[in-house]
Design a protein with these regions (language model features):
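Aliphatic-rich helix starts adjacent to a transmembrane/signal segment
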Residues: 36-54
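N-terminal leader/signal peptides at the extreme start of proteins
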Residues: 1-13
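Conserved amphipathic alpha-helical interaction elements at protein-protein interfaces in regulatory
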Residues: 3-6, 42, 61, 65
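N-terminal single-pass transmembrane signal-anchor helix
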Residues: 10-36
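Short, charge- and proline-biased low-complexity linear segments
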Residues: 27, 52-58
């Protein structure tokens, strides 16, 4: 009779029950975390390429008007709504490269940063 009453008055969890819950949460985290981080990296890479494409559009538009490619990144902020888009892979607005080997060709590339892991950015080639 005393054992039954002591079981009824028992409140809380035993150490074994808590350890089992912590173990289960650890296993679930170990399975889910790599997938989550991979998804985050993929979305950052996609955003960096999308921003580079928007920059390429602005570069091409200004080149059509001026008949030459300008490689100064800051010159395109007004064409992009007032500011250069943030490169989520580098965490900066200077994470894009504009190169113009000739006055009639240019390439725009998003820089590879530590926030995205290993990836190959899309190179946007432009020609006047």
């Amino acid at each position: 009779m005393k054992n039954i009453q002591s079981l009824r008055n028992r409140k809380g969890f035993t150490l074994i029950e808590l350890l089992v819950v912590v173990l289960i949460l650890g296993i679930l985290t170990a399975i889910a975390l790599p997938s989550y981080l991979s998804s985050v990296n993929a979305s950052r890479e996609g955003a960096a390429n999308t921003n580079a494409r928007a920059l390429a559009t602005a570069v091409q538009g200004k080149a059509v008007t001026n008949n030459v490619y300008d490689t100064t990144l800051a010159d395109y902020s007004t064409d992009l709504g007032g500011s250069i888009p943030l490169n989520p892979c580098t965490g900066t607005t200077t994470g894009y490269t504009i190169t113009a080997p000739t006055s009639t060709t240019a390439t725009i590339t998003a820089a590879v940063g530590t926030n995205c892991g290993t990836w190959t950015p899309t190179v946007f080639s432009l020609t006047l």
